[in-house]
A protein has these predicted regions:
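Active-site rim/loop-helix segments in enzyme catalytic domains that contact anionic ligands
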Residues: 3-168, 201-202, 235-243, 254, ...
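A generic structural signal for short coil/turn motifs at secondary-structure boundaries
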Residues: 56-60, 184-188, 222-225
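Terminal low-complexity/disordered tails
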Residues: 225-280
Length: 280
């Protein structure tokens, strides 16, 4: 049987949920339980766009392991429901070749831009390229760390816009999720989180989506509010991510700061909602 294209699948989906994040573990840590509920909803189509490799200046096996960790989180959510149908490949958007991976109704796109570091200064391994420098015109372009594509700021926005439009064709009930770039609401967040959020807000179709805008690192200061069931799925999704990363490259994410990751895992999301425009 021929596999359905995204456009054919869209006709069967009653809702599209697009999650756009900078790093492979952002959606597990800061957007739960929303991602889980959307993934297991039978008529929801879930698209994850991960804008950077999250390489932190390390060797290639680290960012590759992070991608595998994200895939493990998806499989963990879906495997109890039905057999898994997995595919992968590349799609072109604005002549940029973008890697994708699909599992049932969930698709992840990996743009693999270089990690910009917490403050946007980047890392020596990628010649200090970053989305922060790109947005501030401190550099004219930034290249994916696998050399698959080169972007200026407008092209970065356009590629996100093109992926979102391609996947949402024919679906009226549209939701888009991203980390809040407003430092007054979401202070002291990673530069890649902020730049990705700013880009999402500039896509041409943004007003046709219901927007859910999340707090990132600062959510650790909020009280733990997850139910036992929601905590089970959130902690489990991060645990399988962490295991995949460690198994594949020997790096322990938890070793960075165990107490902080516990807070992130035990805390529910802090969300601002922006409704879709009635004029669209």
């Amino acid at each position: 049987m021929a596999k359905k294209s995204p456009r054919e699948s869209s006709a069967q989906a009653g809702k599209i949920c697009v999650y756009i994040v900078a790093h492979a573990d952002d959606w597990q840590l800061f957007m739960q339980p929303n991602v889980y509920f959307d993934m297991v909803s039978p008529r929801s189509k879930v698209i994850l766009i991960i804008t950077t490799a999250g390489d932190a200046g390390k060797a290639d096996n680290y960012w590759m392991a992070r991608e595998e960790g994200a895939k493990s989180s998806v499989r963990y959510c879906l495997a109890h429901q039905s057999p898994l149908t997995v595919s992968n490949g590349k799609r072109k958007f604005f002549n940029n070749s973008i890697e994708y991976w699909s599992c049932n109704q969930v698709t992840i796109y990996f743009l693999r831009l270089p990690d910009g570091n917490l403050d946007g200064t980047g890392f020596a391994s990628s010649n200090f390229q970053s989305l922060y420098r790109l947005k501030r015109s401190q550099s004219s372009t930034v290249s994916a760390i696998d050399h698959s594509a080169t972007y200026d700021w407008l092209k970065f926005i356009s590629v996100i816009d093109s992926i979102t439009g391609y996947e949402s064709t024919g679906i009226v009930n549209r939701w888009i999720h991203y980390l809040n770039p407003d430092p007054l609401i979401n202070p002291n967040d990673h530069s890649d989180h902020v730049m990705t959020g700013l880009a999402v807000q500039k896509i041409t179709s943004i007003n046709s989506f219901q927007q859910l805008v999340y707090t990132g690192y600062a959510v650790s200061s909020h009280p733990a509010t997850l139910s036992s069931t929601d905590l089970f799925w959130k902690a489990g999704m991060f645990a399988v991510y962490e295991k995949a990363v460690h198994d594949l490259c020997g790096y322990s994410t938890l070793a960075e700061n165990v107490d902080l990751y516990v807070k992130w895992c035990c805390t529910g999301p802090k969300i601002e909602m922006v409704p879709a425009s009635s004029d669209v």
